[in-house]
Structures are given as structure tokens and as C-alpha cells.
């Protein structure tokens, strides 16, 4: 580790292979906590490259719980968090809209870190059992079309690093890589990130991970979701090409909605919002979900255009399919699935 620390002190970038090896060292129980803290802070001060992000992602996915990965066509729409906007659970609500549109969703997520309610907190409040094994997750993806992957359970080697991150209380590379460490072999992905200058590096990592299609967005107001407040900065990965662009919500018929208008609350309050959206209630929450789910359906390839994605998202809700997916996941995740273990 000392060699890597010296390079970082000198402001030098690590190669992908160096970062991969450093990542394995970070996960080693024999490494000193002071070394982990120094590495994370120095890397942050230097600025992370796509190669460094990918090298660490390789190490984390290698040490994650193993999956059979026989499920084809899975997608995730997990964002990085960390935008400080305290919005309701946009991506988790959108995940059921995607599932209702016949997209297999492997939703990677965690409890609240910088927000009041994380995806795990919301799903537990709704009645979903978030303690699923890899075999159970495969079963849920195949038979329900949506499954939740509780990040701490999927990545047990990260427990020590999580403690150090909390003690440091500053953003590190781990604030960026949550969506990139999903242990399921995804085909497509929709990623919201809070740092605009990392749009391209994250898209490049998704390309290295072999995604067929992906869309990375930094919303207006630096939201880690697509925002109805104004211009959204976007990077699209398709046919192995990366294109940078921007998207205005007005173009798709949405009224401007300030980010403050879509703030959430505790898990009970956010569960009420999610159920309202999935039940077809008209609101700024619904419009925000339609925009995000529409973009995700476009990123997935289920929709050929963003307009078509928004139409499919609305149908998923208004037909009752999105809510049905939630109810099915609640029932199936709470069954005893010994037959798949």
C-alpha cells in the first residue's frame, strides 16, 4: 500500500491494475485503518479517474457475494446519492414502474446515508423483505421481475470501510461507485450522479463493465436524478459510443418543478408518496417519476425514444402493473424460499 500512497501524495494517477490491487488491499482485514483513511483522502484530493474507478469496482465485485448470473437482460437504476436535496425515493419508486413495463430490475441500494430515507428503509416500510440471498434474488428476478440487493449484505468486505467513511465524514470515491458495484451481470443501466464532472468517467466505467446501453444523468441543481427544475446534463452509452448532451423537461411536456417541491421525509412519509404515485395519483412526484422512468426505459432500449419511454412509464402506472409488481415483491420476498437455497 505504501507505494500507492506515495504516488497519490505526488499527485500521480494510479493505473487500472494498480487501483485493482489497492482495492483488494483496502478490503484486507490486516490493513491499518489509518492507511485506508489516508488512501481515500489522498485519492479524493487528487481527483479520481475512470481507470481508478473501474479498478476499484473490479476489486469490489470480485469480493462481493457470488451470483450465477443466468438472468438475462437485467437493469439497475440506482443513483449515487449524496446530492443533499432530501428528495423522496425517486429511483426506488421508478424501479417498480420499470418492472411494470416488463424490465427486469436488480435494484442495488442501501439505508439512508445523507438522506432521511434510503431505498432499504423505504422498502422495509412498504413490507418488502430486503434480506435476500443471491439465489433468492435470482428467483425474484426470474419470477417477479424485480429484486432488491441490500448493498451491505452483498459486499460484506466493505463493513470496515463503511465505519472509516463515517468517521472521515468527507466524500470519497465510495460516494460514486455504489451503482457500479451491483454484483448482478447487468445489460443496461440508468445512473444518477451528484457530481457533474464525473458524468463522462462514470459512463466510461459502464462501457468497461460491458453495458449494452446506459444513461448517466446529473439533474438540474446537481441532483442525482433527472430533475424537472431545468436543464439535465446527460451522457448516453449506446452501440459502444458515448455521447454527451442535455435534456430539458419542458420538451417532454412537463411543467417546471423546483427540487424543493419534491422533498421527502421519513420512511412512513416516503412510503405514502410512493404508494400515491404507483396508485396513479396526479402530482409533482408522479411527473418526476415519469421523467426518470421514461429516461430509464430509453436507456434500457425498451423505448426507442425518451417520449416513448415516458408513455410506457405512464401506462405501467395507470394500468396498475407497477403497483402489482410492488405487491408481488412484498409477497414473494417474505415467502420461505428454501427451494432455491
UniProtKB/Swiss-Prot annotation:
Binding positions (Mg(2+) 2): 224-225
Catalytic reactions of this protein: N-(5-phospho-beta-D-ribosyl)anthranilate + diphosphate = 5-phospho-alpha-D-ribose 1-diphosphate + anthranilate
UniProt GO cellular component terms: cytosol
Binding, Mg(2+) 1: 91, 225
A GO term, aspect molecular function: anthranilate phosphoribosyltransferase activity
Cofactor section: Mg(2+)
Protein name per the record: Anthranilate phosphoribosyltransferase
Organism in which the protein naturally occurs: Bacillus cereus (strain AH187)
Amino acid at each position: 500500500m505504501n507505494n500507492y500512497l506515495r504516488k497519490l501524495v505526488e499527485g500521480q494517477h494510479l493505473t487500472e491494475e494498480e487501483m485493482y490491487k489497492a482495492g483488494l488491499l483496502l478490503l484486507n482485514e490486516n490493513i491499518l485503518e489509518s492507511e485506508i483513511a489516508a488512501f481515500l483522502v489522498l485519492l479524493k484530493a487528487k481527483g479520481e479517474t475512470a481507470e481508478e474507478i473501474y479498478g476499484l469496482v473490479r476489486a469490489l465485485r470480485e469480493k462481493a457475494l457470488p451470483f450465477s448470473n443466468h438472468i438475462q437482460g437485467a437493469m439497475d437504476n440506482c443513483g449515487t446519492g449524496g446530492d443533499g436535496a432530501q428528495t423522496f425515493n425517486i429511483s426506488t419508486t421508478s424501479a417498480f414502474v420499470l418492472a411494470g413495463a416488463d424490465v427486469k430490475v436488480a435494484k442495488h441500494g442501501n439505508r439512508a446515508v445523507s438522506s432521511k430515507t434510503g431505498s432499504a428503509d423505504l422498502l422495509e416500510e412498504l413490507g418488502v423483505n430486503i434480506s435476500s440471498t443471491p439465489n433468492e434474488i435470482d428467483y425474484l428476478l426470474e419470477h417477479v421481475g424485480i429484486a432488491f440487493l441490500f448493498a451491505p449484505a452483498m459486499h460484506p468486505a466493505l463493513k470496515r470501510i463503511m465505519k472509516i467513511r463515517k468517521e472521515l465524514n468527507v466524500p470519497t470515491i465510495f460516494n460514486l461507485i455504489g451503482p457500479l458495484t451491483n454484483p448482478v451481470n447487468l445489460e443496461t443501466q440508468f445512473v444518477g450522479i451528484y457530481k457533474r464532472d464525473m458524468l463522462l468517467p462514470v459512463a466510461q466505467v459502464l462501457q468497461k463493465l460491458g453495458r449494452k446501453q446506459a444513461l448517466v444523468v446529473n439533474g438540474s441543481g446537481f441532483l442525482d436524478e433527472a430533475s424537472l427544475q431545468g436543464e439535465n446534463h446527460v451522457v448516453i452509452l449506446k452501440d459502444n459510443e458515448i455521447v454527451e448532451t442535455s435534456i430539458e423537461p419542458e420538451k417532454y411536456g412537463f411543467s417546471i418543478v423546483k427540487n424543493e417541491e419534491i422533498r421527502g421525509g421519513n420512511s412512513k412519509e416516503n412510503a405514502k408518496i410512493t404508494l400515491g404515485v404507483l396508485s396513479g395519483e396526479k402530482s409533482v412526484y408522479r411527473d418526476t417519476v415519469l421523467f426518470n422512468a421514461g429516461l430509464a426505459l430509453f436507456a434500457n432500449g425498451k423505448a426507442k425514444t425518451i417520449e416513448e419511454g415516458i408513455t410506457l412509464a405512464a401506462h405501467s402506472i395507470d394500468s396498475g402493473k407497477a403497483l402489482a409488481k410492488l405487491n408481488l415483491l412484498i409477497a414473494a420476498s417474505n415467502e420461505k424460499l428454501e427451494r432455491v437455497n
